[in-house]
Amino acid sequence: MIPKGGSEGDSNSSMWFAGDVEHIIRTQQSARVAIDPKWGVAALLSLAVLWAFAPSGLWLLLFIGVIVLCHEAGHLVVARRAGMRPTEFFWGFGPEIVAFEHNGCRYGVKAIFLGGYVKLHGMTPTSELPPGFAEQDTYRGASHAGRLATILAGPVVNLVMAVVAFAVAARLAGGSIGGSALTGFDHLWFVIAGTGEALWTWVTSIGTYVGSVFDTSGATEAPVRFMSPVSQAEVTGGAVADGWITSLRWFGILSCAIGAVNLLPLPPLDGAHALVAASEWISQKVRRDRSVRVDVRRLEPLAYLTVFVLVGLSLSALVLDLRDVGIG
């Protein structure tokens, strides 16, 4: 229909202009930043108190924050590449401090700076989807390869970050690795091999440490033990004070540890989701039945047990740290 007093060309021009304005409005609305001042002020005050009384703790929070942010970014990027549609990407938990929406995903920072997450719908075979959410955009709607890649992306990013941190530290130190002078990145393999050796040592020491927790005789002591947040903060502060090289090495150790822990096949860690996806894939290949599904919610009791054990190990490490300094 042509408006009164105009031509067909004017009508098309008007329709294009109106559509362009509508697109701009929608873009501005989707990218609108939401800020909650009260939680922002509360978070800043908490950080200020931490800096005043325990600056090492703030440095640890920063190190862990960067590692977790990159970990979750790995999940996010690969999930999109696999055809999934993430709906949330947040650093921290609790109330939102600042957030904005872009391409159907809400990004932001929350008040408790301990961790982060990417929200994917359809993580279980029977979970309900939001209205209008397509099945092919979900985690369960992706291919097995896509699901495995998405789950493993986070830990892999952490391990790559560790290798890079160790390599840069070695480069800055101007030393050698394995008796070979490191004049460039040609000897990066030595760093990767050293990272793998450190990982294996860490994993094999867990059993020894768990045994030492319940050993009341005091006759033996584990050569390696879990570090409580207190000792982690102390080491982080010392690394920062020592300079870039020590800081990079400690950052690499933390990143490597977080990646390794997430690879353990225990819910709610990434390794458990990877194990479920792999078992479904293998079962469907062997039985030639694409309807085979494993509901990760059946592993909830094991998830509670895992959390209980991790909290227990952390508390025991804290007790040992306090005992070392003469408290308790």
Question: Where are each of the predicted segments found?
Answer:
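Long, highly hydrophobic alpha-helical transmembrane signal-anchor segments
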Residues: 37-85, 221-250, 325-328
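Functional transmembrane alpha-helices
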Residues: 20, 134-149, 167-258, 278-301, ...
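Small-residue-rich helix-interface/hinge motifs
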Residues: 2, 10-25, 56-134, 254, ...
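Transmembrane alpha-helices
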Residues: 1, 16-58, 315
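Internal alpha-helical transmembrane segments
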Residues: 59, 69-70, 76, 80-81, ...
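Membrane-interface motifs of alpha-helical transmembrane segments
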Residues: 88-91, 104, 291-307
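Core segments of transmembrane alpha-helices
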Residues: 40-42, 155-162, 224-232, 306-310
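Final/C-terminal transmembrane alpha-helix of multipass membrane proteins
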Residues: 47-48, 163-164, 298-322
